[in-house]
């Protein structure tokens, strides 16, 4: 068996906590697209690097913008 060492993942800093003036808004589609995969799924917190509070806000904003057709549910 090969002995593999795991690299320690560096914890990402939440972009919204670092920049206090930045707000999460469902109408700002260009910001929300960073947190959606190419298949249309919402990125998990461990990949996006957001804190729990802001991840919930991003998820809610993405769902709102999908509902009013600013963001697509799926991407072909």
UniProtKB/Swiss-Prot annotation:
GO terms classed as biological process: translation
The keyword Nuclease belongs to this UniProt entry's keyword annotation: no
GO cellular component: cytosolic small ribosomal subunit
Transmembrane stretches, start-end: none
Keyword RNA-binding attributed: yes
Pfam family, one: Ribosomal_S18
SUPFAM superfamilies found in the cross-reference section: Ribosomal protein S18
Entry GO MF terms: small ribosomal subunit rRNA binding; structural constituent of ribosome
Signal peptide (from-to): none
Keywords linked to the UniProt accession: Ribonucleoprotein, Ribosomal protein, RNA-binding, rRNA-binding
Assembly mode: Part of the 30S ribosomal subunit. Forms a tight heterodimer with protein bS6.
Family assignment from sequence similarity: Belongs to the bacterial ribosomal protein bS18 family.
Task performed by this protein: Binds as a heterodimer with protein bS6 to the central domain of the 16S rRNA, where it helps stabilize the platform of the 30S subunit.
Name by which UniProt lists this protein: Small ribosomal subunit protein bS18
């Amino acid at each position: 068996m090969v002995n593999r060492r795991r690299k320690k993942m560096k914890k990402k800093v939440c972009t919204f906590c670092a920049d206090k003036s930045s707000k999460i808004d469902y109408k700002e589609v260009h910001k929300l697209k960073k947190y959606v995969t190419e298949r249309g799924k919402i990125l998990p917190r461990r990949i996006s690097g957001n804190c729990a509070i802001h991840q919930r806000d991003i998820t809610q904003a993405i769902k709102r913008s999908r509902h009013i057709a600013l963001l697509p549910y799926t991407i072909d």
